[in-house]
Amino acid sequence: MKKNQFLKESDVTAESVFFMKRRQVLKALGISAAALSLPHAAHADLLSWFKGNDRPPAPAGKALEFSKPAAWQNNLPLTPADKVSGYNNFYEFGLDKADPAANAGSLKTDPWTLKISGEVAKPLTLDHDDLTRRFPLEERIYRMRCVEAWSMVVPWIGFPLHKLLALAEPTSNAKYVAFETIYAPEQMPGQQDRFIGGGLKYPYVEGLRLDEAMHPLTLMTVGVYGKALPPQNGAPVRLIVPWKYGFKGIKSIVSIKLTRERPPTTWNLAAPDEYGFYANVNPHVDHPRWSQATERFIGSGGILDVQRQPTLLFNGYADQVASLYRGLDLRENF
């Protein structure tokens, strides 16, 4: 596996920027929740920036045992841990970037059940402990690119999705993989109230082609910065597909179903002209309301330190994944 060396070490987000409270968020540009009604829920260039010297330490999540394969320990710069978990899109807990960190503590992640079903020979059910013990865990430093034209670099911990799917033995009828987030409106205020949850239809659903799901880069993620995922980052298990926009990274997964037909996906249902099924990072295909040619990398500095950088095709992973889309019109199949 080739390394992706497209960022300097000085650009990595520092761990001290990762876990932030609402009172520590400084908004350079603001927008009210009412203004975020669909289909305008994603707004480019509206970034919140974290400021202050009294930031709390990272949450005391469970320390994980994991390896650091050389192939994934590249020289990409890391986004600070407090920014990774303090600046999130997780509409089940509110629309503001700080809402998930403020509100996701209500999510109960243990016990947990993840079911693998559909076009498989051996359906599986995993519990909370299986997620961190059934498969060897490894740390992977990946770029993360939001459709809103900002980006991070994050040291995720998890296991390749293909290892889980192989245990279930997909049948010859399996062509797609459908994912579903937990539906728990008593714990997730955005599922209870359309205003809080951005008007989306819940539970949140996502999907991949089977070959995308089986790709070695596709990661079932259970940790970050050496510890179990905090709730605002999608505990206890989420999906990371580093060559796609962040909304493909479904959080708090309870169901994986292999299907014959392409499954529905939440943002494509909400605004099909703006959010495609594939959602591959592509600087040549703009969002209808903003350019995707460049992005703002979130590092350890404040708003005056933010640098724009060119967006890379497939988020810098073209050598690994471009062959998946040979012959496919990426403008039409965005």
UniProtKB/Swiss-Prot annotation:
Compartments (UniProt record): Periplasm
Signal peptide per UniProt: 1-44
CDD domains for the chain: YedY_like_Moco
GO terms classed as biological process: protein repair
Positions with a binding annotation for Mo-molybdopterin: N88, Y91, E92, C146, T181, N233, R238, G249, I250, K251
Enzyme class per UniProt: oxidoreductase
Cofactor note (record): Binds 1 Mo-molybdopterin (Mo-MPT) cofactor per subunit.
Cofactor(s) needed by this chain: Mo-molybdopterin
SUPFAM superfamilies with a match to the protein in the record: Oxidoreductase molybdopterin-binding domain
Keyword Metal-binding assigned: yes
Subunit annotation: Heterodimer of a catalytic subunit (MsrP) and a heme-binding subunit (MsrQ).
Described purpose of this protein according to its UniProt entry: Part of the MsrPQ system that repairs oxidized periplasmic proteins containing methionine sulfoxide residues (Met-O), using respiratory chain electrons. Thus protects these proteins from oxidative-stress damage caused by reactive species of oxygen and chlorine generated by the host defense mechanisms. MsrPQ is essential for the maintenance of envelope integrity under bleach stress, rescuing a wide series of structurally unrelated periplasmic proteins from methionine oxidation, including the primary periplasmic chaperone SurA and the lipoprotein Pal.
Protein family per UniProt: Belongs to the MsrP family.
Protein's name in the database: Protein-methionine-sulfoxide reductase catalytic subunit MsrP
